[in-house]
Structures are given as C-alpha cells and as structure tokens.
C-alpha cells in the first residue's frame, strides 16, 4: 500500500518529514489518508489522531557491560540513547558497551549522525555525493564521546540498512568500535521524488530518482556493498557453558555430596530474560566476550 494523499494534500514531492508533519495534529482530531493499492482504485481511510510513543532504544546491563539495542532511527533515538547511557553509567561501573543494530532498517539521517556523534570525539561521520563533484555534503561529529572511549562492539547483519550502516561505517572507519556479525544490507542511496501532472488529467504522479549516495569517512560507498564486519560471526547454535555453574561436583571421581537432601532452586528461574537470550544468541554472546576481553587488555596497559 502507498499513501498518496493526506487530507487534501498529495504527498508526491514531499520529504518524509514533511509528510509526517501533515499527519500531526491534536489528539482526537480526524485525518483522511488516501491509499493506493495494486489492482484497485485509490480509496480513503479516516483515522483519529492519538499519541504514538515508539521506543527505539532498549538497554540492559550484564557483568558491567552495557547493552544498547536500536530498532529504528526516529526522532526520539538520540535522546533515548543518551538517557539509556546516562542511567547505565549512574548505576553501574561500566567496562564497555555492545551496540546492536541488527535487523534495523534505518530511518532518519539526522538521527544516524547524532547517534554516531555520541561515540566520537571528532571527524567526519558520513557524506552524501551526487553526480556533480561539487554536490557533496559532509556531516561531522560536534560533541565529545559520551562514553569516554570505553570499549565498543557493534553487531550488524543483513537486515541492518541505511542509517544503521552509516553508524557502523563511521565507527569502523574511525576505529572507535569493533564491528561483528554479517555483512549489512547495502542501502546507501539518497532518493528524491520529482512530481509531475499527467496531461489532460487531474492525477499527480512522480518519478523517484537516485540523486546521491552515502559514503563512509574513508570514502567507501555503502550502496550495494554494505558494511563488512571486522569479525564475521554467523548466527548459530552453540552449547552454553557458564563458569558460574561449574563446581567440584562436576569433576570426574569427585567426592559425593552429603547424604542430606539439598533444596535446589530452579536455575532457569534465576536467569533474567536477557541472560536467557545470551544463552541462545551466539552473536550477542561473542560481542559480550569481546568487550570483556578488550576491557581486560586495556587494564593491563594502564
């Protein structure tokens, strides 16, 4: 389905932000959107405006390592990420961070730039380049690293696209983070819709043209190539081994336990939902291991 009109205004030629702005209004007010669907005539749907809260950032802490999951890049992503980091740093002695943008299809370019800026001190984040060599726009880091240079591992996969690739590519080029997982999608084009009206008709139509491409700080095009991880880790199954649960009774020929009946708690109930996820998410487990290893190495160098 395609939204082709919002109330009386055609959306052809509008940017995403402009179209979203047209949809906004007071809670409870009606809005009519016109939908185009294959093999059917355009039809109208009336909906009632309401508050929509999309939480694009989720966070957890395990073994003093902060986990930051970004599911999309919307207008609240930067503030959500900053709040998550602030809370994590306040309540824990953090060794490093895991940033997870797997299956993140992207979103707002401005938010991708701001999110990257949270982890960088300086330097270029991304550039857009058109056919004309003079048609170049560069986005640079403006703020200091909010995580104070702590070890950072970013997880990507084939579902990481657009804004996700901008973040991963910039952090990789500046050697600020280690990128793991699998090659990203490769959506690095800037597209513009040019509207026009068909002669002898009241219908508006348009042509969507690729007018520019995204480039990482090192000058690599994201389009069609994607971001190749520093360490390629396929998602797979593995047999979990938790050193916390290993004891002498697990050793061969160890002494028997006392004959007294022990009341054992169900270990599964002791694990948080996030710890259970670590048990089955191979890429995530390796990311935590990597942050732990880099943190230990850095401590030996101090």
Model regions and ranges:
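Cleft-lining beta-strand/loop regions that shape enzyme active-site pockets
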Residues: 4-197
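Beta-strand scaffold of nucleotide-dependent catalytic cores
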Residues: 45-47, 209-210, 219
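Aromatic-patch recognition
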Residues: 189-191, 208-211, 223
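Conserved functional hotspot residues or short segments at active or partner-binding sites
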Residues: 213-302
